[in-house]
Amino acid sequence: TEKQVTKHFASVDERTAAIVDSPNDADKRFSRSVDFYLVQDWENAVEDLTQTILCDGSYFIAYFNRAVIRYKQLEYRKAKMDYEESGKGMKLSLKASDYDLIKRDLDKVIELVPDFVYAYYNRANVSVAMNDYRSALADYDKAIEIDSNLADAYYNRGLTHIYLGNNKLGIQDLSKAGELGLYEAYNVIKRFTERKE
């Protein structure tokens, strides 16, 4: 709502004043990055996260949030390019190098906090975007090993298996995702069980 946006902008102003007083305080920079993110000022959010990391290189959630925001920026850019180029008969795509910064941040999160499930899950999603399905499967496996109730990991791993032609494994994962509450998995199962494997 407009009231929430106004509150976040006021918070940005307050946090900016606090940062002027303590420019090397990682927590203050991180806090402001969250406000920038919530008002969708992604460039300033990324800049504050970078400054947070420069102040404290072990601030794992700053690496994670920066990866999440950069991924959102790429997805937004990709959707915009697809829309703009759809009328021209051309299709532009993002390069693997566009995803490298994201993957490096997630690698750092995993280095700092090896059991942070969402780092593996998000890195798997980035690997899928880069058409590196084997790496994606390994990261989905690790995410599920850490949290066996992560329905989205089963769902995405199932889709990846199906894409690679492993329908039986894919359907097993989709079924598990459905059991865990991701009910749209059942629609996907129905589509693929109507086909021959």
Question: Where do the language-model regions lie?
Answer:
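Alpha-helical tetratricopeptide repeat
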Residues: 1-197
